[in-house]
Regions:
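ATP-dependent carboxylate/acyl-activation modules
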Residues: 1-2, 18
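Alpha-helical segments flanking ligand/cofactor-binding loops in enzyme cores
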Residues: 3, 73, 100, 131, ...
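Active-site beta->alpha loop and helix N-cap motifs at the rims of alpha/beta catalytic domains
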Residues: 12, 16-134, 138-142, 147-152
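Short secondary-structure boundary/capping segments
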Residues: 31, 158-159, 189
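Catalytic cores of alpha/beta
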Residues: 124-129, 133, 178-189
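Histidine-centered catalytic micro-motifs
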Residues: 170-179
Length: 189
């Protein structure tokens, strides 16, 4: 299927990182690095993307800066082009080391904003954090709506405000949890 996917014309394929690393080791008893190299061999025309938990790398606890830097270096050396870096609380301090490491390795450092609802999460909040992300050196921003909370008209407002505030590309990643993802994508464009 990789050969067919590579011909579609996707900007990138998120095929590694996050839970896939853990699942390869724990459940499939496979080497996740070997799996990544196989993806790289198969995707000749499509960028490979990974999900990276900031200072937690792919794990569930924080790691030292030198470990983060080395993991990014090895990820790029084994085929990753785009590193989608996030912190579930949008704490940018947990993203800085990974962004610097990705830039040092000439990979695209994409920061994923963990979208959520609540009184604190105003349009001004999202604009401010997007500006700080751009200043940090990220190459792009992804609005990561992992719970499917972003509604269509809110997507129009949010994407519009971010496009006005920053010069780097903006992507949207949403889940179909609430059944409105297709309309959210439509209104975000």
């Amino acid at each position: 299927i990789v050969d067919k996917m590579d011909k579609v014309g996707y900007h990138s394929v998120e095929c590694w990182g996050g839970a896939t690393f853990d699942a390869s080791l724990r459940f499939l008893h496979e080497d996740p690095w070997s799996r990544l190299r196989k993806f790289r061999d198969g995707f000749k025309n499509t960028k490979l993307q990974m999900l990276f938990r900031g200072q937690n790398i792919l794990g569930y606890r924080p790691y030292a800066d030198d470990v983060v830097e080395y993991f990014v270096k090895k990820s790029v050396a084994n085929g990753i082009d785009i590193i989608r870096i996030f912190d579930c609380l949008n704490d940018l301090r947990n993203l800085q080391t990974a962004v610097k490491a990705a830039n040092a390795e000439k990979a695209e450092a994409q920061i994923a904003l963990s979208y959520t609802l609540g009184d604190a999460y105003t349009l001004d909040y999202w604009v401010d954090i997007a500006k700080r992300i751009e200043d940090m050196g990220a190459n792009s921003i992804c609005i990561k709506d992992m719970a499917g909370l972003l509604l269509p008209y809110k997507a129009t407002e949010l994407v519009g405000a971010l496009k006005e505030a920053v010069d780097i590309p903006i992507q949207l990643h949403t889940h179909y949890t609430s059944g409105v993802a297709s309309m959210t994508y439509l209104k975000a464009v």
